[in-house]
């Protein structure tokens, strides 16, 4: 096994790692060969100097090589955020994923429990009755039958256990906050990816381009890792191998601007109840912002040509009950787990 010490020294001296060296470093971290001090020192040296595109590509390559894969259709999309925006909103990408599934576009959603908020995707889905601890075959069935499957990060990235304690002890953001959303176990090549800071918009679009993604929007909206209805959403879009940047406002989606307080959520149980209310017909700011994110996903996937058309398709999936049916089917199929599928 290669040595981590010279790579730590290199980063500590302000130098950047090439992709090969970054891959080597993260192979060492993920194999359990590094000490807690080495892990903490390396992660903080990267953080203080600033992670580069090549370093993230190398790290993601290491993550992907070790993940437990899931089979999904080629046109599947992932709607995911880095988390870490510290705002504590409702589970927007979760509801957007359910709506998107209701339109007939398959969603291979990757996520985790809350880290900095009260409710991550896993918390809300668990409260809705979705079983999380299921194997790849059953997740693939969920995607095929419900149009939506959830891949619980800790089930698919077991090598992360080697760095978990150090991350907790550091108590601050590291490169790993970026790696999860870039390491979808279903290999989804289409993504709506929300980031906690606008500085990561173009770099992460470049990372995903270099890793073979096809159609991606990396978004940041008014402090949130989502398309927002409270102000301007900044977008870096990967289309046909090229990256372009643009801004969106609520007007582009045909919705009224919202106040941030109208989007503040609670814990998993409270957020699950709010999500069910929208599926049952409640019209509020949570509905609007989730529709906007679903609409963005439809445009990314080529299921709609314009945001206006996409909003119509997404609204129909919600109002017709197709989105609610997708969730109900996800709950049913995920709970069919037996000892052979654990």
Swiss-Prot record:
Sequence positions that bind 5-phospho-alpha-D-ribose 1-diphosphate: 81, 84-85, 89, 91-94, 109-117, 121
Catalytic activities: N-(5-phospho-beta-D-ribosyl)anthranilate + diphosphate = 5-phospho-alpha-D-ribose 1-diphosphate + anthranilate
Keyword Metal-binding set for record: yes
Residues that hold Mg(2+) 1 according to the record: 93, 226
EC number: 2.4.2.18
UniProt pathway annotation: Amino-acid biosynthesis; L-tryptophan biosynthesis; L-tryptophan from chorismate: step 2/5
One matching Pfam family: Glycos_transf_3
Annotated keywords: Amino-acid biosynthesis, Aromatic amino acid biosynthesis, Glycosyltransferase, Magnesium, Metal-binding, Transferase, Tryptophan biosynthesis
Residues that hold Mg(2+) 2 according to the record: 225-226
Binding site for anthranilate 2: 167
SUPFAM superfamilies linked to this entry: Nucleoside phosphorylase/phosphoribosyltransferase catalytic domain, Nucleoside phosphorylase/phosphoribosyltransferase N-terminal domain
GO biological process, one term: L-tryptophan biosynthetic process
One GO CC term on file: cytosol
Binding-site residues, anthranilate 1: 81, 112
GO-annotated molecular function: anthranilate phosphoribosyltransferase activity; magnesium ion binding
NCBIfam families noted in UniProt: trpD
PANTHER family per UniProt: ANTHRANILATE PHOSPHORIBOSYLTRANSFERASE (PTHR43285:SF2)
Cited function: Catalyzes the transfer of the phosphoribosyl group of 5-phosphorylribose-1-pyrophosphate (PRPP) to anthranilate to yield N-(5'-phosphoribosyl)-anthranilate (PRA).
Protein name, entry field: Anthranilate phosphoribosyltransferase
């Amino acid at each position: 096994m290669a040595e981590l010490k010279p790579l730590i020294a290199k980063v500590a001296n302000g130098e950047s790692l090439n992709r090969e060296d970054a891959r080597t470093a993260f192979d060492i971290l993920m194999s359990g060969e590094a000490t807690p001090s080495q892990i903490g020192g390396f992660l903080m040296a990267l953080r203080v100097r600033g992670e580069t595109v090549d370093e993230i590509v190398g790290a993601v390559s290491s993550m992907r090589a070790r993940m437990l894969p899931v089979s999904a259709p080629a046109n599947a999309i992932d709607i995911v955020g880095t988390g870490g925006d510290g705002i504590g909103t409702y589970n927007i990408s979760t509801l957007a994923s359910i709506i998107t599934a209701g339109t007939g576009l398959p969603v291979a959603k990757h996520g985790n429990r809350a880290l900095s908020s009260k409710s991550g995707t896993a918390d809300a889905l668990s409260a809705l009755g979705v079983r999380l601890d299921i194997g790849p075959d059953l997740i693939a069935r969920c995607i095929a039958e419900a149009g939506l499957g959830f891949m619980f990060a800790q089930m698919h990235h077991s090598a992360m256990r080697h760095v978990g304690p150090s991350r907790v002890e550091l108590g601050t953001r590291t490169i790993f906050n970026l790696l999860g959303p870039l390491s979808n176990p279903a290999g989804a090549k289409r993504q709506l990816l929300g980031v906690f800071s606008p500085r990561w918009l173009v770099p992460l679009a470049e990372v995903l381009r270099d890793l073979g993604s096809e159609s991606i929007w990396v978004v940041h909206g008014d402090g949130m890792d989502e398309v927002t209805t409270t102000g301007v959403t900044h977008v870096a879009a990967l289309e046909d191998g090229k990256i372009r940047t643009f801004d969106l406002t609520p007007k582009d989606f045909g919705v009224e601007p919202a106040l941030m307080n109208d989007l503040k959520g609670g814990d998993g149980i409270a957020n699950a109840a709010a999500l069910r209310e929208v599926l049952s017909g409640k019209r509020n700011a949570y509905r609007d912002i989730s529709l906007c994110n679903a609409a963005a996903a439809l445009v990314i996937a080529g299921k709609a040509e314009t945001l206006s058309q996409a909003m119509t398709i997404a609204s129909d999936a919600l109002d017709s009950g197709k989105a609610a049916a997708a969730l109900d089917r996800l709950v049913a199929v995920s709970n069919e787990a037996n000892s052979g599928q654990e």
